[in-house]
Structures are given as C-alpha cells and as structure tokens.
C-alpha cells in the first residue's frame, strides 16, 4: 500500500486532497495535513475488511464490484475542524460529484488509531463498505430499509420498529442509538457496525463496554450469540463472506 498523488481522473479534487491510495479499486483521498501513517492504517483496515483471509483476493467479489462501480471513496482530513472547513469550501461541482458519482464516507486522522481511545476507522470504513456495497448487492438481506432481514433483526434489538428515535427505548432493547439526525436507514447502517464489530470482538476492550452501553449493550461475541441470535446467524452465513476475524484488522500503522 503506497501513498501517491491524486490521479488525473479526479483532478477536480486536487485543490482539496493531495494524497491518494487505492485499495482493491476503492479510493482514499486525504488532505496534505493528514498524517501518512493514519492514511495507511485506514487503507489496511479497508483491505482487511474486504480480504479478511489475507490471500490478496476480495472475499466477496460481488460486493467489491459494486463498491468499485459506485466509486466508493474514503475522504480523510487531519481532524473534524478541517473536514467541516472542506465541506464549506467545496464548490457545487464537488458536491454534485459526491452526491451523484462517488459513494463517500469521511474519516478524521485524529480519530484513526488514536493513542488512547477507540479506533474510529473500524466504524467509518465499515460504513463505506456496508452502505455502498452489501446493502446494494443484497437489498433483501442487508438493505437499509424496512423489512430487509437486517432491519427486522434491528427492530428486535431496538424493542420495536421506530421510524425515528423514540423518546425512550423499551427496557428490553440492546440497541438504543439516540442521534435524532439518524433516520431509519441510518439506524440500520449503525446497527450493522455495532453487531459486526461485536462479533469480531472489537468492542471488548478496557472500559469500552461501559462507554458504549447507552447505545449498545452487547460487547462480546458470546453476548451477541446469546442475545441477538438472528444477526449472529446471518453474519456467520458464508454466503456473504463477511469478515470473521479482528486479528487481521490490527496491522502496524507505521
């Protein structure tokens, strides 16, 4: 994995991003101020989500093809402030590109493999893959809408079907995301992340269980298997070639 300059195909983005990596044909654009080792770490996470057995071939070719066809792209900045400035500075042509031609997910260098705290690249990179890939290839299974298989499991996890965040979740719920800007489809995206990273044992570290309990109450694979039986079975269905190991995702960052 090597950082290069932004290719000619994406000249319109050069005023904003100076660094570029492609992973299995998926773009990572980064600002000049984003540290190289953060970019490479994000690229490694992306590579290992897609190629979890590390045989240099994508585990799910259909999902990869969809991601490439959608021009799935991770855009990275030094931190949140820089990302907000970028969105303000983008001309209409860039916003149109993102809206119509690129499947974009942003990620901050400051939240990527931090010295203390959770590695947000595990979340944001997975959102890129599930939203632009799995939900499109398998709409009846992973679609981010009512009545897909994953949405039905999410409704169980939330204690009911809620189009918007309820004023109070049922006490039986183990998924209780409370961001009121997150609509139903967004809730599915977040649920996919919480459940899969729990299966990978990525949430079971130090005080993490307490830190996330207001949104997600399962933090070990065993708890997921015992409580969220439907999603546990779905994620272990080899039809979909989802990642099964977190060890491949903790690669050196420099």
Report each predicted region and the residues it spans:
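N-terminal low-complexity, Pro/Thr/Ser-rich intrinsically disordered segments
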Residues: 1-16
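Extracellular/periplasmic catalytic domains that process cell-envelope and extracellular macromolecules
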Residues: 21-22, 66-69, 184-188
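Acidic/His-rich structured neighborhood in mature extracellular/periplasmic domains
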Residues: 25-26, 35-162
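A short, solvent-exposed beta-edge/loop patch
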Residues: 26-27, 199
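Post-HExxH zinc-binding segment in Zn-dependent metallohydrolases
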Residues: 134-190, 196-205
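Surface-exposed intrinsically disordered loops and tails
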Residues: 207-217
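Membrane-interface transmembrane-helix boundary segments in multi-pass integral membrane proteins
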Residues: 215-229
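Conserved small/polar residues in nucleotide/adenosyl-binding loops
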Residues: 247-253
């Amino acid at each position: 994995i090597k950082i290069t300059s932004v290719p000619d195909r994406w000249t319109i983005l050069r005023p904003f991003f100076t660094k570029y990596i492609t992973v299995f044909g998926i773009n990572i654009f980064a600002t000049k101020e984003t540290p190289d080792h953060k970019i490479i770490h994000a690229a490694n996470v992306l590579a290992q989500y897609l190629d979890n057995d590390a045989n240099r071939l994508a585990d799910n070719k259909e999902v990869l093809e969809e991601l490439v066809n959608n021009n799935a792209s991770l855009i990275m900045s030094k931190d949140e402030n820089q990302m907000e400035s970028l969105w303000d500075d983008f001309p209409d042509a860039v916003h149109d590109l993102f809206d119509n031609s690129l499947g974009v997910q942003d990620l901050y260098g400051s939240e990527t493999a931090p010295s203390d705290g959770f590695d947000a690249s595990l979340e944001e990179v997975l959102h890129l893959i599930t939203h632009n890939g799995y939900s499109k290839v398998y709409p009846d299974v992973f679609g981010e809408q009512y009545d897909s298989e994953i949405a039905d499991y999410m409704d169980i996890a939330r204690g009911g079907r809620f189009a918007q965040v309820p004023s109070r979740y049922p006490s039986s719920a183990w998924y209780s995301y409370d961001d009121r800007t997150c609509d139903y489809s967004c809730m599915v995206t977040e649920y996919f992340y919480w459940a899969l990273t729990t299966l990978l044992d990525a949430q079971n570290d130090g005080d993490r269980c307490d830190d996330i309990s207001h949104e997600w109450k399962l933090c070990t694979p065993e708890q997921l298997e015992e409580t969220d039986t439907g999603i546990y079975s779905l994620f272990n269905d080899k039809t979909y070639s989802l990642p099964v190991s977190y060890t491949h995702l903790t690669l050196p960052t420099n």
